[in-house]
Structure formats: structure tokens, C-alpha cells
């Protein structure tokens, strides 16, 4: 039986196995405190998250179950990899994932990225999205803080706490608003994987510009910023609005023509980058480019390899999503998922394979942003 250590970190009681040492708080993730820790078995740093009050209610328990199921199922080089799950004697749940040096938000806060980074990063984001979407999963919360990067420029999408098959109600996180697709703001009853493509387009624009494209102060201001650049929503979008108040708001907007996107990025921006941006930032999601088609775009030709852009083995099983179960039942189901994971060897994501044939200089980011990658090794 595993031995456990107890510690208090930022006022939160941590109860973890002796496998992990040198815990340091690194932030709050979705519904949990996250610490870096050194894994004495793999000799690697991990991100160790304590799931806050997973059994306080059925909705929280269901969310925890969903996140664990997704982390177990989704296995791809550009997605964060599950390393360990365990339940403490106090019946708290801990999830360990691989730890990368920094996130895209921190890099963008220092200085604009060179064009080579923007190109390579958006390729990896779209490569990950192709896999996620093939599993019939929508991330729903794609933003720079959820894009993790290491010193070799390997990129991984993280935080699947909000991922869904579909979700009629939009979430209200201010930090997410900048990257939120128009169809969510227009309160469509159903939306699809295209919302992630919009978010990725906003991220590409931010990497090219060095600042957010649509930094809305609220939902109304956000939509004004979008129409200022992309013009008024077309008839095909208006026909899908079901809320009378939303329709009234959209119809009250002044008439605006779409701007040339070359005017919102630096003058030396690659033409192909602007063209891809145009295909991603389309108000009507039905004609927005897919991740698979975006990977074929000329802008990403230096990295595109159809034989090395895998899809999921099959769609993720969402049969639990509409279940309305008591928290005790969710608890039993969560324990079952944890035991199932522990009954087999924890899969290792391995090293990224993109560098083998890629023309990218994989040490370039370390030279540019070395301050973010100082403490990469375990305890001496």
C-alpha cells in the first residue's frame, strides 16, 4: 500500500504519495490547486493537481469524472499526457500530468513572437485539434494559458475541464471571452468543433500582432470588436439565432463592411498567414475551415505531413453526459476509472516526434525566452 505525506500548500492540505517530492505551487487550474512535483519513479517533473471538493455535489463529481475519462482517452503528442491518478486516505483525488516549462500567455506577455514561432505553434495547435475533433470532443476553452510549451518548442493543449460534445450554455469566464466564438455569444442552442477553430484563429492573430485581437470588456463590447473587423453577421448566421433579445441586439448594430485582415497585423506578415487567418476567423461556423483542412494550408506546408497527423481510434463515449446521477454514484464511477487506470501500466507520451523531419530550430525558444526554462531538472 502506498505511503502518503501530508503538507499544507497555500492554505490547502495536500496528501500525496511518497513517489512525489519537492512540491511547489504553480497556480490554480480548473477546479483545483496545481503544484509542480518531482516524480521519483520517472525522474521527471509533473504537474500535480488536487481536485477541489470533487464530491461536494453531483455536478462537481460529474465534472471530475468527465475530466478523468477524457485524460485517459485522449492520447496525442500535442495534448497534455496523464501520468498518474490516485485517491488519498482523505478521499481527495489527485491527477498528475506532464509538466512543460511555460505557457503561451507568458511568452506573449514578454515580447511579440518571431514569425517562425507563430507558424510552428499554430501548426501544433491545429494538429492537436484535428485529433480532439476526430474523437467528437470540443475543447471549448482554448486560450494562451491552456497552451503549454517547453524549451524545445514542443506544444501541448491542456485543461479539458470544460470539454464537451456540445453545450448550449456558454461559460462566463472573462479570461476566455477574447477567444470565444460568435455562435456562443449569439446563444445558439447547439454549436460544434468550429468554436475551437475560432479560438485558434484568435490565438494566431495574437501571436502575429503581439496583443489580443478582440479584447472585449464585456459580451456586447466583444461582439462590437468582432464586427468592426469582420463586418456584420451574414443572413445564414441570423437565421440560427433563437433568442429575441439577441436578434434585436444584432439588428441594432450599425452597418459594417469587413476589413482587410492585412491591416490588423504587421506589414511584413506572410501572405499565407493572413489567408489562413481569414479562413479561421469566419463568423459563420458552417464555412469556417476545419482543423484537417487548415493543416493542408500553404502557410503550414513546411510542417504538414498527412502520415503524421493522427486521428483518434474512435469517438469518445459521451453516454454519461446526459446522466443525472447522485454524487454517490459518480463517486463509485470515478473510483472505478481510477482503479482501471492503475490496473495497467501508465502510458508514457514519450518525446515529441515532430523534430525528426521538421525544419524548425527546436532550441530557438530556449535562447529567446531562457528565463522561463531555468528549473527544468529535478532536485539535486
From Swiss-Prot:
Report the active site residues: 141 (proton acceptor)
InterPro entries reported in the protein's UniProt record:
Kinase-like_dom_sf, MAP_kinase, MAP_kinase_CS, Prot_kinase_dom, Protein_kinase_ATP_BS, Ser/Thr_kinase_AS
What family is it from?
Belongs to the protein kinase superfamily. Ser/Thr protein kinase family. MAP kinase subfamily. HOG1 sub-subfamily.
Please give the function described in this protein's UniProt entry. Mitogen-activated protein kinase required for growth on media where sorbitol or mannitol is the sole carbon source.
**Pfam families linked to this entry:** Pkinase
PANTHER family, per database record = MITOGEN-ACTIVATED PROTEIN KINASE
Q: What residue stretches are annotated with the Protein kinase domain?
A: 20-300
Residue window of motif TXY: 171-173
Sites where the protein binds ATP: 26-34, 49
Protein name per UniProt: Mitogen-activated protein kinase mpkC
- Which enzyme class, named as a word? transferase
One Gene Ontology molecular-function label:
protein serine kinase activity
SUPFAM superfamilies attached to this UniProt entry: Protein kinase-like (PK-like)
Amino acid at each position: 500500500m502506498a505511503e502518503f505525506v501530508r503538507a499544507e500548500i497555500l492554505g490547502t492540505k495536500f496528501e500525496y504519495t511518497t513517489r512525489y517530492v519537492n512540491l511547489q505551487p504553480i497556480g490554480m487550474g480548473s477546479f483545483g490547486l496545481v503544484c509542480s512535483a518531482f516524480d521519483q519513479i520517472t525522474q521527471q517533473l509533473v504537474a500535480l493537481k488536487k481536485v477541489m471538493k470533487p464530491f461536494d455535489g453531483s455536478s462537481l463529481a460529474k465534472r471530475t469524472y468527465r475530466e478523468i475519462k477524457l485524460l485517459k482517452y485522449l492520447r496525442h503528442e500535442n495534448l497534455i499526457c496523464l501520468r498518474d491518478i490516485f485517491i488519498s486516505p482523505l478521499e481527495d483525488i489527485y491527477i498528475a500530468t506532464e509538466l512543460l516549462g511555460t505557457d503561451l500567455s507568458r511568452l506573449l506577455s514578454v515580447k511579440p513572437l518571431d514569425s517562425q514561432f507563430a507558424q510552428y505553434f499554430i501548426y501544433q495547435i491545429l494538429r492537436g485539434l484535428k485529433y480532439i475533433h476526430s474523437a467528437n470532443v470540443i475543447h471549448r476553452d482554448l486560450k494562451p494559458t491552456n497552451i503549454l510549451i517547453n524549451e524545445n518548442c514542443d506544444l501541448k493543449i491542456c485543461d479539458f475541464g470544460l470539454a464537451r460534445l456540445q453545450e448550449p450554455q456558454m461559460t462566463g469566464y472573462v479570461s476566455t471571452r477574447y477567444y470565444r466564438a460568435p455562435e456562443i455569444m449569439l446563444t445558439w442552442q447547439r454549436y460544434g468543433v468550429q468554436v475551437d477553430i475560432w479560438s485558434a484563429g484568435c490565438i494566431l492573430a495574437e501571436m502575429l500582432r503581439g496583443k489580443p485581437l478582440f479584447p472585449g470588456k464585456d459580451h456586447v463590447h466583444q461582439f462590437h470588436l468582432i464586427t468592426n473587423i469582420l463586418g456584420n453577421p451574414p443572413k445564414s448566421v441570423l437565421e440560427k439565432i433563437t433568442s429575441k433579445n439577441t436578434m434585436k441586439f444584432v439588428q441594432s448594430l450599425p452597418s459594417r463592411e469587413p476589413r482587410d485582415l492585412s491591416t490588423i497585423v504587421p506589414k511584413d506578415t506572410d501572405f499565407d498567414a493572413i489567408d489562413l487567418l481569414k479562413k479561421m476567423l469566419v463568423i459563420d461556423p458552417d464555412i469556417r475551415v476545419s482543423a484537417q483542412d487548415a493543416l493542408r494550408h500553404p502557410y503550414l506546408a513546411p510542417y504538414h505531413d498527412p502520415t503524421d497527423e493522427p486521428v483518434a481510434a474512435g469517438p469518445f463515449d459521451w453516454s454519461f453526459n446526459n446522466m443525472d446521477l447522485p454524487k454517490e454514484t459518480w463517486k463509485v464511477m470515478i473510483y472505478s476509472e481510477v482503479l482501471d487506470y492503475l490496473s495497467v501500466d501508465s502510458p508514457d507520451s514519450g518525446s515529441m516526434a515532430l523534430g525528426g523531419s521538421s525544419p524548425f530550430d527546436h532550441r530557438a525558444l530556449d535562447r529567446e525566452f531562457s528565463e522561463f526554462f531555468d528549473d527544468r531538472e529535478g532536485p539535486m
